Amino acid sequence: MTHVDQINVDQINIDGFEFGVQSSPGPKGAVVTTVFVIVHGIGTSHRYSKPLYGAIAANCSTYTVDLPGFGGTRTPKHRLRVEDYAKLLGDLLDTLGVTSCVVIGHSMGAQLATELAVQRPQLVSHVVLIGPVADAHRRTAVAQAVDLYRDTLKEPFSANLLVFGDYARCGLRWYTKTLRAMLAYAIDERIRCVVAPVLILRGRNDPIARRGWCSILAHNSPQGRLLEIAGHRHLVHYSAAVLVADRILEFAGVPRGAAE
């Protein structure tokens, strides 16, 4: 992972829901004020985004969050919809003093990023959806499980270790409740309401966020475009972190090494 001089770690409560937050102010002497926010997928945590976080934080102010019920945060008493998570995330960013950001969501996190951009268009300048779910033609628990299994077989062992460790920490009950929320969210319809530029990024060999599905999202987005990374899968932000960071920074108009 790219070295980051300073990482701040906080636990923040928003309306009784606990978030974990890691943040870096970016490099000393940075002349770019763009803020990036990374949102993880179902069952996981900030841990599998560390390589991407490091690559972006070496250039800009960056936050990565653990959503309520994930990454060791307190499990909510009731299921949260994607819309609820997005509302809480927006309130969290208000608390952190973030007034404009590039929001990056992976997998289910892409749903939250989309919904945040719909709910708070003035807060979100750019949207990056990495391996977005759930394919409208495969929006069942069984289909998602099959695709996840196929993906896992060829992901890096270190990535699988992180992901399944987080699954265990999350627990089956909360995972299942959140899965229902994930499958109920029609990202292909909600993305039509996003006014910010949208970058849809997938590993070319991703069996979860397939090319046809991602092409639909890019088409439905008023300012959407699709980018594929050859040789990578659903965890492309982990296995090709530096390349993915480069593409995201380029999309947001931020030069690498933007420091004096």
Language-model features: where?
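Conserved HGGG/HGGXW glycine-rich cap/lid loop of the alpha/beta-hydrolase fold
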Residues: 23-72
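Active-site loop/oxyanion-hole signature of alpha/beta-hydrolase fold enzymes
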Residues: 47, 63-104, 246
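Flexible "cap/lid" loop of the alpha/beta hydrolase fold
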Residues: 111-119, 123-155
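Hydrophobic, aromatic-rich cap/lid helix
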Residues: 160-189
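Short alpha-helix in the alpha/beta-hydrolase fold that links the catalytic acid
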Residues: 187, 196, 210-219
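Short beta-strand/loop motif that positions the catalytic acidic residue
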Residues: 194, 200-202
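Acidic catalytic loop of the alpha/beta-hydrolase fold
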Residues: 204-209, 234
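Catalytic histidine-centered segment of alpha/beta-hydrolase-like enzymes
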Residues: 232-245
